Amino acid sequence: SLFNPGMEQPPLDLPFESGIVWSYTSGPHAAWGAVEVRAALDFAPPADAPGCLPNSTWITAAASGLVVRSDNGTVVVDMDGDGNEETGWNIVYLHVGTTHRIKLGTWVEKGDRIGHPSCEGGISTGTHLHIVRKYNGEWIPADGPLAFKLSGWTAKAASVPYQGWLISGDKIVKSNRYSSTPAHISRGD
């Protein structure tokens, strides 16, 4: 079995700075390329217009760890710090722009700035962040026994990919690719 009984996801924060309103643009969907595991969530920064435009809003580390990949729009943070993406928990950040992207080998603390959202590193119709968890090299479904939890918000999948919710107590944020108000979310810390 991939997981030990009673195992829980380590605490993770929403991947942006406190007080900045982002949009939850895609609920659980494919982690990487054609991979069928619905492990990824998408967040878009505040923007004046849609599309692939430069954005100065910061993506922050959801967890502390070692940057084991930083290229082609991708940053991977290895939470156990052993330098191996195939062991323990790893957080994958996709569409991280080249400008100000954190350097390979850097140790980050939760909340540290790691770069800016972009359209780099894969197919994208608009500037956003695609975030995914891996455990022992396997993509972890965003909705399931180890649901994706960020700053107390838990991901819930709809019946079709890209749709879903983030739920925290009685608060619900519904994914929306057009960044409408019901999709707005911010860190309250």
Name each region found by the language model.
Residues P117-L129:
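Active-site loop architecture of trypsin-fold serine endopeptidases
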Residues P54-L104, G126-H128:
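Zn2+-dependent peptidoglycan hydrolase active-site motif and core
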Residues G33, A44-A49, H100, D112, ...:
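Catalytic cores of extracellular degradative/oxidative enzymes
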Residues Q9-P11, E17-G19, E36-A40, A62, ...:
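Extracytoplasmic
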Residues Y24, H130-I131:
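Hydrophobic alpha-helical packing residues
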Residues N4-G6, W22-A61:
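Short glycine/threonine/proline-enriched tight-turn/helix- or strand-capping micro-motif at secondary-structure
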Residues Y24, I59-A61, G65-V67, G105-P117:
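A structural signal for short beta-strand/turn segments enriched in small hydrophobics and glycine
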Residues S1-L12, L53, T106-E109, V132-D189:
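Acidic, glycine-rich catalytic/binding loops that coordinate metals and/or anionic ligands
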